[in-house]
């Protein structure tokens, strides 16, 4: 479900049109790339702030994008019971690993732990294979009304985004608040490079080329 990430990116890009201030000059060519990344420096670059936008305008735009996607009348996020939720591909009337994993990535970056945990619990229950040749992998499409898998196979971008989001969550919230995020991420990673071809299920990560 690529619509969620596309909308998030679109919302960020719309800052240039929606909150353009009269005193913000065209920033192109004025912002030199950093010599070191955030992983090394511990500082995450806010290019909109560097470009001259006000922090309150940036925050308001992000809050509006989150509201539209997760809370508003046209949301794609739906809660199930007391502790689960899924992201719907409204057009195709299913839930997909791309949508769930993108939703988790948005939740962890915006410090929405309850939303993150709800999405992950639904994912584990209805998408993740718990045994057999596909153990650790995810069914890429599920009917959210019945919980039945539309396809047993995986779409690797979902696996990669699940791992990334879980590692982010481990770093942000720790692993002793109800879900061991690191252990969950490690389980997926271990599955991604340990398949032996049984039933045609193969590694997602190429162990020879580390890709």
Stretches with model-predicted labels:
Residues 17-21:
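Boundary at the C-terminal end of the N-terminal hydrophobic targeting segment
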Residues 6-16:
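Bacterial N-terminal signal peptides
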Residues 22-98, 109-144, 149, 200-203, ...:
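Low-complexity, Ser/Thr/Pro/Gly-enriched N-terminal "stalk/linker" regions
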Residues 93-103, 149-173:
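Aromatic-rich carbohydrate-recognition surfaces in CAZymes
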Residues 1-4:
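Positively charged n-region of N-terminal signal peptides that target proteins for export
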Residues 167-211:
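Aromatic- and glycine-enriched pocket-lining scaffold segments that form the walls
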Residues 103, 115-116, 178, 185:
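Solenoid-repeat scaffolds in large eukaryotic assemblies
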């Amino acid at each position: 479900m690529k619509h969620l990430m596309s909308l998030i990116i679109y919302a960020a890009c719309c800052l240039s049109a929606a909150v353009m201030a009269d005193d913000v000059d065209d920033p192109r060519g004025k912002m030199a790339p950093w010599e070191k990344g955030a992983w090394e420096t511990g500082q995450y670059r806010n290019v909109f702030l560097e470009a001259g936008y006000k922090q309150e305008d940036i925050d308001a735009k992000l809050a509006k994008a989150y509201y539209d996607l997760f809370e508003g009348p046209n949301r794609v996020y739906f809660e199930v019971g007391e502790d689960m939720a899924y992201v719907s591909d409204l057009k195709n009337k299913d839930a997909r690993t791309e949508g769930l994993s993108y939703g988790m990535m948005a939740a962890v970056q915006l410090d929405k732990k309850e939303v993150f945990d709800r999405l992950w619990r639904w994912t584990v229950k209805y998408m993740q294979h718990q045994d057999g040749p596909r153990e650790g992998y995810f069914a890429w499409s599920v009917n959210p009304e019945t919980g039945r898998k539309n396809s047993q196979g995986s779409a690797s971008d979902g696996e990669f985004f699940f791992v990334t989001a879980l590692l982010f969550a481990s770093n942000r919230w720790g692993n002793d608040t109800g879900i061991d995020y690191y252990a969950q991420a490690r389980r997926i990673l271990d599955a991604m490079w340990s398949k032996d071809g049984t039933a045609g299920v193969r590694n997602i990560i190429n162990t020879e080329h580390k890709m």
